[in-house]
Curated annotation (Swiss-Prot):
Keyword Protein biosynthesis: no
Alphabetized UniProt keyword annotations: Cell adhesion
A Pfam family: Nckap1
Deletion consequences: Cells have defects in motility, and various developmental defects, notably in aggregation and adhesion.
Annotated gene: napA
GO biological process: one example: cell motility
Similarity annotation: Belongs to the HEM-1/HEM-2 family.
Species: Dictyostelium discoideum (Social amoeba)
Assembly, per entry: Part of a Scar/WAVE complex containing brk1, scrA, abiA, pirA and napA.
Top-level taxon in the UniProt lineage: Eukaryota
A GO CC annotation given for this chain: cell-cell junction
Name this protein carries in UniProt: Nck-associated protein 1 homolog
Functional summary from the UniProt entry: Involved in regulation of actin and microtubule organization. Involved in cell adhesion.
Length: 1160
């Protein structure tokens, strides 16, 4: 054989073989799927024709053979079928041609060499064994193609039909297809001539392979330990030990396929022992991607049926059984131990190289060996996880022997980090070995190559040696991009010559040359093949074939709370970014899109699972614990210990003791605390993982992991805000109890705790949680339908679409509060308490929902925008109620005008009879409702002022100063409306410049209605004759009337000012003063008349003192009246006596003690 063409032949054979292997795999996958293979294969009519066609395969019927009935169904679409089958036919054809060429190459090498030994010539031996393995894989894969006979027969027949000439390769290829029905048996027959060459090559591993697979031996030798000998930390590691470790994965395949194809080499105890050990490591041997073979079944068949004059394998059958048993019972544990060892060493390397990258160059061979071992173990794990062993091995299988690898994620991540680190410092490593070759390696080679050795070598060997030496001497150490392809080709030629039958050198002399050139060969690959080495040892993209177990590992990793696996979860996303570009091949370009789309879906699923896990822990476990701790500070927890000390106190039957503060730290609760810590750790590790990269491109999508988390946290906050505000679900026992939303002060404190939990995420992942919180809260408490700010007519018409916003729940509740709950009998507004209170026994506890504390919480939560929405609903209620009052006024307009003209005359009592008591009471009832709404609005505005003052004091002061620069804009002069609206929105006390109320009441006050609204003071003064005033009582302790009638003062003041300003033609506040004076005058006359009546008469109140006090309170509250305004009609002495009667009268004092503040 001409040694000069050997490198090129190997390169062509191996490259073509790998391409053909991929093409055969594509054909196998396509014809395995009935949905994508050519449609005529599934046609029942044509299937009978196809069976007849291949009945005597590879012999095919002639065209005029009438035995194939219906053959015209195929020929009618001959062109279409030829196009469908052409690629697959020529794939099989190329496989056959490659098989012939590769066998000739191996046979020529075998016949022309004394021995091929890995230790003597790494390059030649590895290439030879790689071709051997490829040979077997291609034969096996072709044998698996389901319809290979039909493909070739139909194509050959249609080729003959269309071109009137036979397809030239069909006859030989057809016989080969028949022969490989049992591919390994055929290969064994063919390889009898290669037994010696294969045996010599595999014998290289007999003494070392088993030792280098035992963990105890590896630890003892410090195989991957870089700091075992600190004094050698900077010295390069380049012995055969590490080099062989780097080839470990390939060596296993060389041994198993080699002994399977060339069983004649199993002639020594050492070879039998090597086979036994290798078989005990696995029960599936990888062929290509997801295809594996049951290696024990194949060897069992071989040992049973192989016949040879030199060896009797039947006597050795027991080793197959022992190895099969070990592969299921012992191998999982051994591989788990190996993974632990490799992971520990990789972690040590990562920490060392990251800190001292200068050590990468001298220790690169150790790193490559570690990466190779890690890759082998990772693929072994996924190939043997959750799979049922083959038939012959299943009987030894016990699922309990399986070892679940909890840290496979960290192993994948460490491999990736180290590969990236080498890429980062690639130039440094290349420089190091380029200088090494041009220096120490050349000197070492020159010492070995003596003149005497060259003289003994002969001219051909000497020429090859000189070529290599001259090339190495011509190296430029500064040329980083130097290619050593020529050197390696020359070394292969020389290695072949040294191993050839005609080589005159002794074996010891040859070893001197090969040992140094093997070393230079290794160094050269570290210069120009570093990327290829990293791809070979660190590329995990073939895990796509095991994507199901791979992503089961991901699912287990993100919920792992025992180690650091969650922090490595992003390695799966990185793999998904690599799959589309590396798994898809040039022979099936459509696959890239299919894989890419699936990777995008998987990436979306992975990020969703990670972020859901984080949010679930934060929003459920941690938040619920923090909220529980917050509840320990509730008032009841302070009262409960005091109640326990009382001897006469007994808890109710259904009483649940409150949580004792600090109880979570008690020893009996340690399990809960440990669980909390574990889940916190899990969530924060996942957050750390999201920080690994800002964004990642997967196929045609760019994923930003942090945005997934940000979106989920925002959704969790929204969900919590919406759910926690809702009232508890009513039960049968609570059906009669009034259901309210959560108290806003409680809700605010709970929300602050929940937000505090979310802020913890900011410590571990680069997300602006503050911005997220502001954005979410603004979204939840802002209605887009609000008009432009700075205008008095901002009220949107109709209903505001708020969907399920938190603001909708709060607004709906306050609408219900204003329209129903505050108007419930037993609920009154207390000026002393600055809020609403409820009488004992009233289901609705107004003091829990309508006091300044709750209003402050409301303003803190919803802000000015939310307050405007609530204020809109309050004003709409006032408008609706005022409209109904207008109807009553219209019906009684004539009587009111007549009474207004004669109220001071004796006939006024006769005129009074024209009014229905129900109308008077209805006016009072509606006015009380309006008063409640106005008081609630005032409380909200006061709270809004406090909130803005606390948060934006300078803005609030600036608005207040601007507002005080002019007199109150009672009549809505346009020049001042801008500042008026700012003052209103800031919560300032605008007094008679309440423009929003005036704007909303304009809708019921047209020019035609002016006369009606002028009668409003008269109507209010007549209401004292109604039944509501008759039954009222003034409660001094709460400064309120028992039936809440005192809120009329707020209603009367605000409505008279508003309608007076709306209907004014002069813009003079004197008009408003006259309106109030008219009310006081008529009311005073009416009340003084009541003094003439007797207790119990129709128009006489039961407690007339309360009516007098009401007028006094009204005068105090009205901004346009003063004390002397009332004294013109009711003497101060009378008012003082009324107060005295209420506060000092014994009977009233007794009654006061019975119906004191505690009843409200």
């Amino acid at each position: 054989m001409a040694h000069t063409n050997l490198p090129e032949k190997f390169q062509v054979v191996i490259e073509n073989g790998e391409n053909i292997l991929q093409r055969v795999y594509n054909t196998y996958k396509l014809f395995q799927n009935n949905k994508v293979k050519p449609s005529f294969f599934n046609d029942e009519k044509i299937s009978k024709i196809l069976k007849n066609l291949i009945a005597k395969y590879p012999e095919l019927p002639e065209n005029n053979d009438k035995s194939i009935t219906g053959f015209d169904l195929l020929t009618s679409r001959a062109k279409q079928h030829l196009e469908e089958l052409e690629d697959h036919y020529y794939t099989i054809t190329d496989a056959y041609d490659w098989k012939e060429a590769s066998f000739i190459l191996m046979q020529e090498i075998s016949s022309n060499t004394v021995s091929i030994n890995f230790n003597n010539n790494i390059q030649l031996c590895s290439k030879f064994l790689d071709v051997l393995v490829l040979y077997g894989k291609i034969n096996y894969l072709v044998s698996l193609i389901p319809d290979k006979k039909i493909i070739t027969a139909v194509y050959a027949k249609l080729f003959l039909y269309t071109r009137s000439a036979s397809e030239p390769t069909f006859s030989k290829m057809g016989r080969w297809i028949n022969d490989i029905e049992q591919p390994f048996k055929k290969i064994q027959e063919e390889f009898r001539v290669l037994n010696d060459a294969v045996g010599h090559a595999l014998s290289s591993f007999e003494l070392t392979y088993a030792k280098r697979r035992v963990i105890t031996q590896l630890r003892k030798d410090g195989a991957l330990n870089l700091i075992l000998k600190p004094e050698d930390i900077a010295r390069p590691v380049q012995d055969s030990y590490r080099i062989e470790l780097a080839y470990a994965g390939r060596i296993q395949q060389w041994i198993l396929f080699g002994y399977l194809f060339a069983p004649g080499t199993l002639s020594t105890p050492q070879s039998i022992e090597l086979l036994r050990f290798t078989l005990s490591e696995c029960f599936y041997l990888s062929v290509f991607k997801d295809i594996s073979i049951s290696i024990h079944n194949e060897f069992n068949t071989l040992f049973k049926n192989y016949k040879s004059k030199t060896i009797n394998l039947q006597k050795q059958k027991k080793i197959i059984k022992d190895a099969a048993q070990a592969s299921t019972q012992e191998a999982p544990r051994k591989h788990a131990e190996r993974r632990v060892y490799i992971r520990q060493e990789l972690e040590a390397m990562w920490n060392l190289f990251r800190d001292k990258p200068c050590l990468l160059a001298p220790k690169i061979n150790v790193l490559l060996a570690a990466l190779s071992m890690a890759k082998e173990e990772i693929f072994w794990y996924f190939r043997h996880t959750d799979v049922i062993p083959p038939e012959k091995v299943k009987k030894f299988y016990n699922k309990q022997n399986e070892v679940r690898e909890k840290r496979i994620s960290s192993l994948l991540s460490l491999v990736d980090h180290l590969v990236q680190l080498v890429h980062t410092h690639k130039k440094m490593i290349q420089n190091y070995y380029l200088e090494y070759i041009s220096g120490a390696d050349i000197l070492g080679l020159q010492k070995v190559i003596t003149p005497q050795l060259l003289q003994n070598a002969g001219s051909i060997v000497t020429q090859a040696v000189n070529t290599i030496v001259n090339e190495l001497k011509s190296l430029n150490a500064n040329g980083q991009d130097y290619s050593f392809e020529g050197f390696r080709a020359n070394w292969m030629r020389l290695g072949y010559l040294l191993q050839s039958n005609s080589c005159p050198l002794k074996e010891s002399e040859s070893k001197q040359i090969t040992s140094r050139l093997n070393l230079i060969y290794t160094h050269s690959k570290n210069v120009d093949c570093l990327d290829q080495l990293l791809d070979e040892y660190g590329n995990m993209t073939q895990l796509w074939s095991y994507k199901e177990p791979l992503f089961h590992s991901f699912d287990a990793a993100i919920v792992d709370m025992t180690c650091d696996q969650p922090s490595h979860s992003m390695i799966y996303l990185k793999l998904l970014s690599q799959f589309p570009n590396h798994v898809a091949n040039q022979f099936y370009p459509e696959e890239k899109e299919l894989i890419g789309k699936e990777c995008v879906e998987l990436a979306n699923s992975c990020l969703t699972k990670i972020t859901n896990r984080i949010v679930s822990i934060m929003a459920n476990t941690i938040a619920s614990t923090f909220l529980s701790d917050e509840q320990q500070l509730a008032d009841v927890n302070a009262a409960f210990p005091l109640l326990q000390k009382k001897k006469d106190w007994k808890p109710p039957k259904d009483f649940v003791p409150p949580i004792e503060p600090a109880s979570e730290s008690q020893f009996r609760n340690r399990a809960n605390l440990e669980q909390l810590r574990s889940e916190e750790k899990n969530a924060f590790q996942l957050c750390t993982a999201l920080n690994e990269f800002l964004d990642i491109t997967i196929y045609d999508h760019i994923f930003v992991p942090r945005e997934f988390l940000r979106e989920k946290l925002g959704s969790a906050l929204k969900q919590y805000m919406r759910q926690s505000i809702q009232p508890p679900a009513p039960t049968s026992s609570s059906s009669q109890i009034d259901i309210n939303i959560t108290r806003l002060s409680t809700y605010e404190s709970q929300l602050r705790v929940f937000i505090g939990v979310l802020i913890l995420v900011e410590n571990h992942v680069d997300i602006d949680i503050g911005d997220l919180i502001r954005e979410t809260i603004l979204t939840e408490f802002y209605a887009k339908a609000l008009g432009k700010s700075g205008r008095v007519d901002w009220f949107p018409e109709g209903e505001i679409e708020m969907n399920e916003l938190t603001l909708h729940s709060i607004t709906s509740y306050y609408v219900d509060l204003v329209s129903k709950k505050l108007n419930t009998p037993g609920v009154v507004f207390s000026p002393v308490k600055l809020g609403f209170i409820s009488k004992a026994g009233t289901p609705f506890r107004a003091e829990e929902h309508a006091d300044l504390t709750e209003m402050r919480a409301l303003c803190d939560l919803v802000g000015p925008y939310g307050i405007k929405v609530i204020e809109r609903e309050i004003l709409r209620f006032i408008l609706t109620t005022t409209t109904s009052m207008k109807e009553i006024l219209s019906l009684n307009a004539a009587n009111l005008e007549e009474f207004a003209s004669n109220y001071y005359k004796p006939k006024a009592m006769e005129l009074l009879k024209k009014f229905k008591t129900t109308d008077l009471d209805l006016i009072v009832t509606k006015s009380i409702a309006i008063g409640n709404a106005l008081h609630l609005r005032s409380m909200i505005r006061e709270s809004m002022k406090d909130v803005i003052t606390d948060n934006f004091p300078y803005i609030n002061n600036a608005v207040a100063n601007a507002f005080d620069q002019y007199n109150r804009n009672t009549f809505m002069f346009p020049d001042f409306l801008g500042v008026d609206t700012l003052a209103l929105d800031s919560g300032l006390n605008v007094g008679i410049a309440d423009q929003y109320l005036k704007v909303i009441l304009r809708k019921v006050s047209s020019e035609a209605d002016k006369r009606i609204w002028e009668l409003l003071p008269v109507m209010f003064s007549l209401t004292f004759y109604g039944n509501i005033w008759k039954e009222t009582q003034y409660k001094a302790t709460i400064d309120a009337h028992s039936n809440n009638v005192h809120v009329l003062s707020k209603t009367i003041i605000d409505l008279l000012i508003a309608f007076g300003a709306i209907n004014s033609t002069t813009g003079n506040e004197a008009e408003l003063f006259q309106s109030f004076k008219r009310f006081l005058e008529i009311s005073s006359v009416n009340i003084l008349r009541m003094f003439k009546g007797k207790q119990g008469e129709k128009f006489v109140p039961n407690e007339i003192q309360s009516v007098i006090i009401f007028l006094d309170k009204f005068t105090q509250q009205c901004p346009l009246l003063s004390k002397d305004s009332l004294e013109q009609y009711i003497p101060y002495s009378l008012i003082r006596n009324m107060y005295k009667d209420l506060y000092e009268h014994k009977n009233l004092q007794k009654q006061q003690s019975e119906t004191s503040e505690q009843n409200f």
